[in-house]
Amino acid sequence: MAFSISSTMIFLLSLALFSTLVSADNHLLPGERLNPGNFLKQDRYMLIMQEDCNLVLYNLNKPEWATKTANQGSRCFVTLQSDGNFVIYDEHEQEGRNEAIWASKTDGENGNYVIILQKDGNLVLYSKPIFATGTNRFGSTAVVVAKRNRKAHFGVEQNIIEVTTNL
């Protein structure tokens, strides 16, 4: 009995650690979302979906960029759609629908997209650069070509990111 309790505790602790690491990623792939309190993190930069429905990019504790959507909903999340649009939705669970309250307006063809919080603090939507917060420090102009079950390398030297995708 002691063995199964210990095994269960180790398993639960592993799950807790894994879920913590997942919420500290620096990127979102299509279909992934940040719920209230979830964030992307890269060094001293953090993009957080706040409880008040405002999506804010912080440099340490100083806000650098925001969607200015505070109090425009009650249960918001942000997601990267398969068409390349980065959208904040207010979730109306009882009505079975979501209402868009902000979008990057980068929708196009379905494809391979990734949104990355770079090492320089710039939040960039890649397939080719089509949306950025304008907070870049090193002038990156990378292009991503993500393929099924492959690694993608992108970013200028100061911002090199490697993401393994299962698109």
Swiss-Prot record:
Residues 25-138 form the Bulb-type lectin domain. It is found in: Secreted. SUPFAM superfamilies: alpha-D-mannose-specific plant lectins (SSF51110). It comes from the Eukaryota. Residues 1-24 form the signal peptide. One of its GO terms (molecular function) is D-mannose binding. Keywords: Antimicrobial, Disulfide bond, Fungicide, Hemagglutinin, Lectin, Mannose-binding, Plant defense, Secreted, Signal. Disulfide bonds join C53-C76. InterPro entries: Bulb-type_lectin_dom, Bulb-type_lectin_dom_sf. GO terms for cellular component: extracellular region. GO terms for biological process: defense response to fungus; killing of cells of another organism; positive regulation of erythrocyte aggregation. Expressed in the pseudobulb, with highest levels of expression in the non-swollen internode (at protein level). The keyword Nucleotide-binding does not apply. Mannose-specific lectin. Shows agglutinating activity towards chicken erythrocytes. Has antifungal activity against A.alternata and Collectotrichum species. Homotetramer. Mannose-binding activity stable when incubated at 85 degrees Celsius for 10 minutes, and increases 3 to 4 fold when incubated at 85 degrees Celsius for 10 minutes in the presence of 0.14 M 2-mercaptoethanol. Mannose-binding activity decreases to 27% when incubated at 85 degrees Celsius for 10 minutes in the presence of 0.35 M iodoacetate. Antifungal and hemagglutinating activity stable when incubated at 100 degrees Celsius for 5 minutes. Antifungal and hemagglutinating activity increase when incubated at 100 degrees Celsius for 5 minutes in the presence of 0.14 M 2-mercaptoethanol. This is Mannose-specific lectin.
